[in-house]
Amino acid sequence: MSLMTPEERIDRIRGDHWIAFDRATIVLNRLTSLMEMPQQSRMPGLMVYGSSGIGKTMIAKRMASKYPTQYNAELGATKTPILLVQAPPAPDERRFYQHILATIGAPMWGRHTVSELEVRALSHLRDMDLRMLMIDEVHNLLAGSYREQRRFLNMLRFLANDLCASLVVFGVNEALEAVRGDDQLARRLDEHYLPLWEDDVEFSRLIQTLIAAMALEQRSGLTVASLRTILKVTGGVTSRVFIMIKSLAIDAIETGEERITDEAVQAWQPVWTKHAWNIPRQPAAAFG
């Protein structure tokens, strides 16, 4: 029996806490390996790509949380091993530098040239002993012209070179070719593809992992048919799988069932409407 009340258990399920699963662990291990590499002038990096909702941002936030900012009172210095920032809505260098400065708590007010923002950002990042720069939503660069995309990617490469830091970018499938368009950057970034979930053992393990994390008091022995229903309803998108399992677990607690049943899976109604989401096709096998 749980020591928490039903309300406390439900609040915990609804909370934004990390639930480890195999695919995410593989990416995190790759990122950890980059962090543990000796610093050099041209650090290797990684591009993690896949459909929207597949878990990229979740993984990025988890990685950043493993290397939190630390303040050394004796030295009066702040060390930030990893900086996670979101790409601006369009490939805009000024906005990107402003966002970096705001994220690290050093905003520059008033009008400044891109060069001034760049110098200030680099100065702070060097002082923070940055080892990895992670850019989420890198596909936002597609909102710009070809020339703007090239300039933005060149800026990212310059930052990584100047700081001797690993560059890690996260984006949807469509961003892959844009990043590959910068030959020098593409050679530095290994690629890790996160596909949609399929009807296989890996998906079964994911569901088992998620249900176990819900800490229900009874065992949920779902049939293969139920697993396929979950896959069909969610379209194989990680975020929707999480939403569905969490919703079913909350229902199980509220009703006193304390387990997710086949009947509950079949009866579950998605919180998204059928016309509100489109699952893109998997990229060609060559991208895997």
Tell where the protein language model's regions lie, with residue ranges.
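A short hydrophobic beta-strand->loop->alpha-helix junction that borders the nucleotide-binding pocket
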Residues: T78-P91
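Post-Walker A helix-loop "phosphate-sensing" segment adjacent to the P-loop in P-loop NTPases
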Residues: S65-G76, A106
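Pre-Walker A adenine-sensing motif
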Residues: L28-Q40
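The catalytic "switch" region of P-loop NTPases
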Residues: L142-G144, F152-A225
